[in-house]
Amino acid sequence: MAAKIRREDEVIVLAGKDQGKRGKVSQVLPTGKLIVEGINLVKKHQKPNPQLGVAGGIVEQEAPIQASNVAIFNSATGKADRVGFRFEDGQKVRFFKSNSELVK
């Protein structure tokens, strides 16, 4: 199945503690989860590793979020939108369902 949400897409969170926030997808995991910049931040206790030059402490990092809890953001309408697929000139392209514009 083709991916409706891909890397570098701007998404908006529909459910959870970060509901309503927007961010850019930095990674799509094969388990159906996404890592979105600035969303679902968790504190990780990092053990120091002098061989790699890593300082210890508590660091904040993005945790994966379920893909069903986000929707692609349509900048033309300023709202969350659904994505469809169609063929144009032999190429399969994604488009927004609300206004039929192509996803960039």
UniProtKB/Swiss-Prot annotation:
Keywords: Ribonucleoprotein, Ribosomal protein, RNA-binding, rRNA-binding. It holds the Pfam family ribosomal_L24. GO terms for biological process: translation. Gene3D superfamilies: 2.30.30.30. CDD domains: KOW_RPL26 (cd06089). One of two assembly initiator proteins, it binds directly to the 5'-end of the 23S rRNA, where it nucleates assembly of the 50S subunit. This is Large ribosomal subunit protein uL24. It comes from Shewanella sediminis (strain HAW-EB3).
